Each structure stands twice: as structure tokens, then as C-alpha cells.
Design a protein with these regions (language model features):
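Cysteine endopeptidase catalytic domains of the caspase/legumain-like
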Residues: 1-463
Length: 463
């Protein structure tokens, strides 16, 4: 719960990939079944020649050369049957005849001694695969924890290079060199690149229309289906007050609602509107930051009440909430405020339209994990969602000087189709309160300044 980087990393990589014309799906806090369904939806966006990119930040491990992403509901200790195998996802992407497959894995690669299975995933020789591991084999990945807005170590340097018009392996080589000069993690974390890329492929390559133009159009519509925001609306009350509701997307499964009074009678001395059906301690705050909206705060209109709804993938019915208006008039004296209410239905916003909460539907992702000698088996009954990963015992690390307060990094992802998975720490349906998830707005781009700050007071947090 105390970790901050994954949500920030996913948000910033999402914006960078969009600048490169990627269709990005960015998701936080997914259970196993939600992750499998999200992968299936991601695969629907792929076809011949498409560049597919998946970024993941969070709990993970590596056994026998296979990497495993850990969902938020994985038991402790977890096994491969509770996780998603990255190589299994790659095999499914290969079946789509993608032009480039890029995996950026921002997670630890330590062995999981609770998992003794030996995967046997046979991949095709496609000469278009690039892996960028945030750390070396059998090592940990870190985020730098401080009082300021912060990235994980990998993304801190990746975001400065991602838009470079260079072959993707050249970009990652330069990121590795930058990370190697960062004193805070030197000797503890080093980027590892694995590639079978035989052509010059860059994330900046222009999008071209080929034989699959019609198919690409269909896939773009499929992506748009899960990223349409509710239209802003005006609510008029009998007392003469008019309220405007606006909506913004922080991630594919996080919605921001802002409420603003645009008109009221001249003799109304007090007027306030807020959303019911949500926890008032978490919602209807007067600044975005109070409600946990740190990343969008600068682009939202001012002088509103703000509400943040996360984990939209769990929404089973249409989203209906009540707007309550309170007001007093000059003629009322000391009488209590009058209340008016209106019900609002915004159907299923953003990723909620895809019903990722259902049991695994298309068996593509699951079947790949069920190959002979595969580490996975049928997941059985769906686990109840836990809000946070359970951290293992880190007592063995606490003896390291200057690197205390060690905790695991939560799950995050971006993906061109680009897909970021993110394991932030906000609970289902409600935003985190400022005390539990405090992320400032701006990030420093000055590496030297960051080094000085972190060398003086550094907390390394492995994933």
C-alpha cells in the first residue's frame, strides 16, 4: 500500500505511447481472471504487422527462463497456477503474426521456491521479439521512495528515451547505460535486454495502411468501445440551480467525475452539490489531490467537487448514482438547507463495457497455460479480490545499510497496441485517501538532483 511508482509509471508511459499513435489499454489492480480476460481483449486488437507492446510493473518472479506476473488476488505463497506467464502471452501474440513484440517487465526476477513446475512453452522463430527486463536474472527491481512524485528506477530513465527515433534495442541499450550511471542502484539493479530482432524496428515507425486496413479499422473500434467517456451533462433543478457533470479517464479502469454549479438564483445564499452512493470521506472533495487524482489534477477544471472511481472492471451493472443539491434562500432565516436529488445513469464507462470481471471466457490465454508440462492449471473458483499484494518477509534485507524500508512494488501495465498493467493501491470502487496514497503532481527530470536527494535519504523497494 505504501508504494507509489507503478501508477505513476503506467500513466506516464501511456501518454508517451499515445504520442507514438499506439492504442493504449492501461489497467490497475487486476485479479487473475481479470488479467486473463484483459489479455484476451488485448489479443483481439492484434493482427498481422501490428506492433504489440506490454509493460508490467508489479510483483513477479522468474523460473527456468519464464517470467510470471502476479495478480492482486494471488495467495501467499503463490504458484504459477495463480499467475500469468509472459511467454504464454507471447505465444498467443505470435499467432497474430505481429510485426514486433516488445515486453518491458518492471518486476523482480528472483526464483520462486514455492513453485517447482517446469514450463515447456514452445515459441516460433519470428525474429521480432524484444525483452527489456528492469533487472538481471535472480535480482530485484526497485522503486525509489521519497516524499515527491516519483517513478520506478526503470521508467525514470526509459521515459527519457522512449520517443527517440531509433531501433528499439538501441533505445533500451541507452536506457541501460543511463541506469548504469545511477549511483543509487549501481550494483543492485541493471537493465537486461534479450532480442531476436533481425530488422530495424522502432516504436516511432509510422502507422501504414496495408491489406489489413479494414481489419485495423474494426480493431480500432473495438479499442474505442472500451475507452469512451460518458458525455458531459447538465442537470436542472426545480429551484433554478443548474449543475454540470464532467468526466475524465485517468486510466482505462479509473474514472473521474467532477461537479460544478453553473447557475443559481440570486437570492440563494448557500448552494452545494455532491454525489451520493459513495463514501463521503473518500469522494466529493474540493481539490483533485484530496480525492487521489494527482496525475490529472492540472488538466481538470477548477472550483469543482471531484470523485474518483477505480476498478471499473468490477462493475457488473450500469453505473447509477444520485446527485444531491443542498441550498438555502435569504427568506429562510435559520432554517436548515433544503435538499433536491436527481438520479444519473452513465451506463458502463470505459473498460467496464468489456465485463472483465466474468470468469475466463475465451480460453485462449488459459489454454496456453494448459499446454503439456505447463506450470498452469485451471484456476478453479475465482478468488475474492484483495486490494493489496501481500509482501513476503524482507527481514533479510533490512540489514543492508542505507537501504531500509523495503517493500514490494505493485502491479502496473501499458500496452500498440500497447498494454500497461498496473497494480496501484486504490481499493475497488473508491479512490485512496491522501493519507494512504500521496503522490505529488510534478516529476523532476533532473537526474543529478534526483541522485542527490536519494543518496541522502534513500529507500529502495523491490517488486
Amino acid at each position: 500500500p505504501q508504494l507509489k511508482a507503478p501508477m505513476v509509471d503506467v500513466y506516464e508511459l501511456t501518454n508517451l505511447l499515445r504520442q507514438l499513435n499506439f492504442k493504449v489499454v492501461s489497467l490497475l489492480d487486476l485479479t487473475e481472471s481479470e488479467m486473463r480476460n484483459a489479455v484476451d481483449e488485448f489479443l483481439l486488437l492484434l493482427h498481422k504487422g501490428v506492433y504489440g507492446l506490454l509493460y508490467y510493473a508489479g510483483h513477479g518472479y522468474e523460473n527456468y527462463g519464464n517470467s510470471f506476473m502476479v495478480p492482486v488476488d494471488a495467495p501467499n505463497p503463490y504458484h504459477s497456477a495463480n499467475c500469468l506467464c509472459v511467454q504464454s502471452v507471447l505465444k498467443l501474440m505470435q499467432e497474430k503474426e505481429t510485426g514486433l513484440n516488445v515486453f518491458l517487465l518492471d518486476m523482480c526476477r528472483k526464483r520462486n521456491f514455492h513453485d517447482d513446475s517446469t514450463p515447456n512453452i514452445v515459441l516460433r522463430v519470428t525474429a521480432n521479439i524484444v525483452f527489456g527486463y528492469a533487472t538481471c536474472q535472480d535480482a530485484e527491481a526497485f522503486e525509489l521512495s521519497s516524499t515527491s512524485f516519483i517513478n520506478g528506477v526503470f521508467v525514470k530513465f526509459l521515459k527519457k528515451r522512449l520517443l527517440d527515433d531509433e531501433k528499439i534495442t538501441v533505445v533500451l541499450d541507452r536506457v541501460a547505460e543511463d541506469m548504469g550511471q545511477f549511483d543509487a542502484t549501481k550494483g543492485k539493479q541493471a537493465l537486461e535486454i534479450r532480442s531476436s530482432l533481425s530488422e530495424r524496428r522502432a516504436l516511432t515507425d509510422p502507422v501504414v495502411s496495408g491489406d489489413g486496413h479494414d481489419l485495423a479499422h474494426v480493431h480500432s473500434r473495438q479499442w474505442a468501445k472500451a475507452h469512451e467517456l460518458p458525455e458531459s451533462m447538465s442537470l436542472s433543478f426545480d429551484c433554478g440551480v443548474q449543475i454540470k457533470l464532467g468526466f475524465a479517464a485517468e486510466f482505462s479502469n479509473v474514472l473521474v467525475i467532477y461537479t460544478h454549479i453553473v447557475k443559481k438564483p440570486a437570492d440563494m445564499t448557500f448552494c452545494q452539490a455532491h454525489d451520493l452512493d459513495v463514501d463521503p470521506k473518500e469522494m466529493n472533495r474540493e481539490t483533485p489531490e484530496e480525492t487521489g487524482i494527482y496525475l490529472l489534477s492540472s488538466s481538470l477544471p477548477q472550483h469543482c467537487l471531484y470523485t474518483r472511481l477505480s476498478s471499473l472492471q468490477k462493475l457488473r451493472e450500469e453505473l447509477v448514482f444520485t446527485v444531491c443539491l443542498q441550498g438555502t434562500f435569504e427568506s429562510m432565516g435559520e432554517e436548515p438547507p433544503i435538499h433536491w436529488t436527481k438520479s444519473v445513469n452513465i451506463r458502463k464507462p470505459l473498460i467496464a463495457r468489456l465485463d472483465l470481471h466474468r470468469p475466463v471466457r475465451r480460453n485462449s490465454c488459459l489454454q496456453t497455460c494448459l499446454m503439456p508440462h505447463s506450470p498452469c492449471h485451471s484456476p478453479g473458483p475465482e478468488h475474492h479480490a484483495h486490494l493489496y499484494h501481500q509482501a513476503p518477509d524482507y527481514s533479510r534485507l533490512l540489514s543492508q545499510p542505507h537501504f531500509l524500508d523495503v517493500a514490494e512494488l505493485p502491479l502496473g501495465a501499458v500496452g500498440g497496441c500497447g498494454m500497461p498493467f498496473g497494480d496501484g493501491t486504490s481499493p475497488c470502487g473508491l479512490s485512496s485517501s491522501p493519507g494512504r496514497f500521496s503522490i505529488p503532481i510534478e516529476a523532476s527530470d533532473d537526474i543529478n538532483e534526483v541522485q542527490t536527494v536519494f543518496i541522502n535519504s534513500l529507500q529502495l523497494q523491490p517488486q
